[in-house]
């Protein structure tokens, strides 16, 4: 190693070639990093610049035109005298370092000349590889001391062969290989400052070592185990600052040129005792060379460069030799918190260039390169550049360099690339490089296949587009006008682009659109295909309405539209709460079951408004055609999709609320069973891919909320009923109907009658009378009709009382209406003047025109008009009462019992009457006759009741042989109404026992429950409706099965008010409730008339008549 004092002897003045070297350097000094991963290249002269750059630059340092060495470190060989001087001074310097610095392991290098203010300096101990020619890439002109003035030879500074201590920079992702540039980014400001000072001092040498962790990102080596111990000795050819993407701070980008392999022997991390113990005064003791300014030649390429620090030749005049201690080149780095390392050079193991294995591996690498180059143009450029840099022209002569090149251009794993760098055995290195290159070959094959597939698709589309453009041009030249088909095709394309069609649907759409483009508009198939595409593009694929999961808003909306219906409202609120927690909701299938007029259909619309969904309703009552649900086949003329697809088209969303009304009245015919078609539609597990016969593509209905309505569940097929969540809506009681009438029905009817703001009062007692005497059903539909009738009658009376003068017909018409009336009268007068008899068709058209609505002015009612409708004058508006009372008997005779029934109209009181058809004699025979339009179940109930009543009499009243001789007739009034259901058992039994015991029943007791032969009372349904009917009939007690106790407890208090509920388990309990004061001795006496006694009475009567 040469000390600074010896520099003038080695670097002689080369003034004769100063201008030529300076001119050459100016064209190559501006170095720019290549924005790509991996190895990076710098700007080259135009004649040596490749046509394309790859992600891994293969630019090696270029020597002179006639240079025969590969990666040669000099432009011109040194003289024998200079070479001997170098060796002598190196030996002297080594001895001085060993004696004076026993603790320090780092050696000193040549002192650099001072850097000028613009960041450019001539290198004394080394040169910049990026700014000149040759492997070192730069040239420097030392001082003229020690060289004769007449010596004009120019010697290029040599890269130090021994540089024991350098600053270490960790590298991420992939290692550096000797001879191949790489750009790195320094984010640590301390490291960036150290690099800047190194460049200014002319010591731009660092050690680059690969991180073991791929995700590591640091500019300082904290621990020796964090990096691999084999790296490269690299020269910083240029460096320039860059702003970060976030605009905060700045980083330094440096271009490194690796020269040789080195091994890390010792790490001196920042802040270590060894680094702190070194006296910083050594740096200050170093003599500062004074630069001799030289005129600089600036060309266009240099002006465009953005290099902050580069290396050019410059003349340096050193100061006189000082008497201080020898200069240490890296001592100035001790003040920076950077990592320093002691390194040793690694040399390749000797090998036989003629080895058959090496030659075979070399040939294989060359063959793989050829194959990769044929598939990847970037590799082709890299190989071309590598070949140009090899002046020998024979890759066999440099197998080690070929292995490094193979690893440098391959995108292998960091560990695999590090193994190539760490291998000093050439044969082993080539094997590992071949493995990495083979993997790159596989990647290139896959990339080539993908590229070909993409190109084929693009080429096909481009060809189709080119042909279509040609066809349009031919039509335009021939003057053939477009038939509108092209516009239609473009319209369908635009509509489809706005939709998120599934892949299967998109394929069908493309096929049909292609078919449409090739069909003639006059063809019948053209209209079929056009209609199909129109439906396909009107389905809201991927479009959903924003749902409202606000609980308070839902409560407000539901309460505004409906009174009561607590169960339904709670279920909807549960649905909204689940959607709020999950962020989304799936489609559900709800079925509202209840009597007519309770709000089943209208509640569906309120639910849609509360959820913010679109609403669609269709009825399936009496539906017999499956095509109404699943659509028609396209082969039929006038084919249409099913009602569900029509609902999606109308609502324009995938998540509407669809109300299927009257699902219990669906029919069945020769065209199929619609209820079976609904199985797929209303199954959450299947409707995600609902297949309509017309569309013939799967449609997702899983987001649709289906709501069905029915009066009864008996007629709904069981598989279909199982798919729905049934919510029962019971009938309204009198109090609820009163509230509904006051809050909803009366204001609506008043507004519809044109009496809004007019003092027309419908009193509370009038509404009660309507409920009691006119509208006894469980719903409010008839009540609504009666209230509307009341307000219509009121409007008629008001208009009649005010008279025609309040608003004459001439003043009622607006200007528009008057013009229409004048036109009509003019036409009539013209027809009359012509005397032509108008035809029936003309008369019809004239009448139609006359009946056309004409704009009119609304009549204003004076404020003094007051109308009051109360209980007394109610019949003047709605007529006489329809019902007098539910109670047929104020006092029931023996054999008459009040039962309770549950029908589609709600609950009703049902009497059971039993009479004795003839006198009880010893000769009479027992019999039972049943009337009242009873169906099978009630007939069986009557038979069971008759048998059980006979058993009770035989057991408890054996002497009363009533059923042995009695001819009994049992009747249920209102025979025009069919009656069926298992809930009249105890009522019939009680009626028969009342007749047998000749004891009347309390008329304020009603009962319901089915009976077994052993006397067990079974559970029934519709207890709420039946309780409402009992209350309406004025009952005070309701007897019901004990199994229905939970239903009784759920009844609102206003329903149970004034009624005592008595649950029973056995009929014996019913008997004790019905006959609490029965005289058992009297009841146990026989009521049969003996035959001899009757004969004596008859003969005596006959004799009396004869006398």
From Swiss-Prot:
Catalytic activity: Hydrolysis of proteins in presence of ATP
Transit peptide, residues from-to: 1-31
Biased composition (Polar residues): 51-60
Residues forming the catalytic site: 983, 1026
Protease recorded as keyword: yes
Gene3D superfamilies linked to this entry: 1.10.8.60, 1.20.5.5270, 1.20.58.1480, 3.30.230.10, LON domain-like, P-loop containing nucleotide triphosphate hydrolases
Annotated GO MF terms: ATP binding; ATP hydrolysis activity; ATP-dependent peptidase activity; sequence-specific DNA binding; serine-type endopeptidase activity; single-stranded DNA binding
Protein origin, superkingdom: Eukaryota
Residues at which ATP binds: 594-601
Keyword annotations: ATP-binding, DNA-binding, Hydrolase, Mitochondrion, Nucleotide-binding, Protease, Serine protease, Transit peptide
EC number annotated for this UniProt entry: 3.4.21.53
InterPro entries, per database record: AAA+_ATPase, ATPase_AAA_core, Lon_bac/euk-typ, Lon_lid, Lon_proteolytic, Lon_Prtase, Lon_prtase_N, Lon_prtase_N_sf
Biased composition (Low complexity): 832-845
Protein location: Mitochondrion matrix
Keyword Zinc set for record: no
Domain Lon N-terminal: 166-441
Biological processes annotated in GO: cellular response to oxidative stress; chaperone-mediated protein complex assembly; mitochondrial protein catabolic process; mitochondrion organization; oxidation-dependent protein catabolic process; protein quality control for misfolded or incompletely synthesized proteins
Biased composition (Basic and acidic residues): 80-101, 142-152, 815-831, 846-856
Entry's family note: Belongs to the peptidase S16 family.
HAMAP family according to UniProt: lonm_euk (MF_03120)
The protein's name in its UniProt record: Lon protease homolog, mitochondrial
Native organism: Neurospora crassa (strain ATCC 24698 / 74-OR23-1A / CBS 708.71 / DSM 1257 / FGSC 987)
Lineage: Eukaryota, Fungi, Dikarya, Ascomycota, Pezizomycotina
Originating gene: pim1
